[in-house]
Amino acid sequence: MLLSKKIAVEINIAGCKLKQYTAAMLRQHNIDLTPEQFLLIDLLWNQGPMSQLDIADQMQKDKNSITKLVDAIERKGYVVRQQNPNDRRSNTIVLTELGNSLKDDAKTKGIFILNNMLDGIPESELNSFLETLDKLCSNMTISDREL
């Protein structure tokens, strides 16, 4: 198998395993969120209220996927949509009291989950891995001249 193909396959497998592992660990720690829902709520904890468009940009997802994610966590009572006073066509996603109440416990458990995943890997290797991932992502950014 070509090295480039092997790398692409391994990145895909790692992404799938990350979602499966995180979902299982969230369930095990009684956090009623999918990994993507957790990431969205974590984004709101860190950034504050955001438009769905900004969330889509930050999470690298299309608007329809974000709408479904917001719908799901809104049904659970973690967020509400508030109409943007400056643009009636857009909504701002705001954490509810329930959404904010998860923060300390969920962040602590989230850090524990991630630390378990990285257990036994030296920090120098993790830093090299991050540098390589950054380069891969840069190479995969589509510019106007490539279209």
Where are these regions (language model features)?
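N-terminal leader segment of winged-helix/HTH proteins
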Residues: 1-29
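C-terminal regulatory/oligomerization modules of transcriptional regulators
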Residues: 1-2, 124-147
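Short capping segments at the starts of secondary-structure elements
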Residues: 47-51
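Residues within helix-turn-helix
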Residues: 52-53, 64, 71, 91
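Charged, amphipathic alpha-helical coiled-coil/dimerization segments
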Residues: 71-131
